[in-house]
Amino acid sequence: MSGLRLPIFVLVALSVPLGCAVAGEALPVAVDLRVDAQRARVTRLPIVLFFHSTTCPFCRELEELHLKPLQADNEKAPRFLLRTVEVSQTRPLVTFDGSKTDFRTYARQQGVTLVPHLRFLGPDGEAL
């Protein structure tokens, strides 16, 4: 039960609209999760992966109303490492174990079937 506290807290925090971030600001895209894991280990911050699709209106709403404002605050006082994964793209990605894949394949491997999907991870890629 205690393993659910962080995700539930974050979901509750995300349910309260924070306003809009500056238009056009892009969220950080996942490139090398190994590097992100090293940073998470040093800073002791969780990694939040945002799986989304450009054709998903709920994804856009979550991004604009919640994730962009959270990321803007997060840049001033870091609380997590946010990375995005667009589930229909074949953009290259290095996974936590150093293997090379692409966004679409990685999302499938992670069992992501619906978007938006938030995944809260520790520095070794383990679910929190």
Which stretches of residues belong to each language-model region?
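Thiol-based oxidoreductase modules, predominantly thioredoxin-like and allied folds used
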Residues: E75-K100
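Loop/turn elements at helix/coil->beta-strand transitions in domains of secreted/extracellular proteins
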Residues: R44-I47, P78-L81, L114-V115
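N-terminal "domain-start" segment that seeds a small globular fold
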Residues: C20-R39
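Typically the conserved alpha-helix immediately C-terminal to a functionally engaged Cys/Sec
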Residues: R60-E75
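A short, hydrophobic beta-strand/beta-hairpin element that forms part of a small beta-sheet core
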Residues: L114-L128
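Solvent-exposed loop/turn segments at secondary-structure junctions
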Residues: T54-F58, H66, V87-P92, G125-A127
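Bacterial N-terminal signal peptides
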Residues: P7-P17
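Short active-site neighborhood of thiol/selenol oxidoreductases, capturing the structured segment around
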Residues: T43-C56
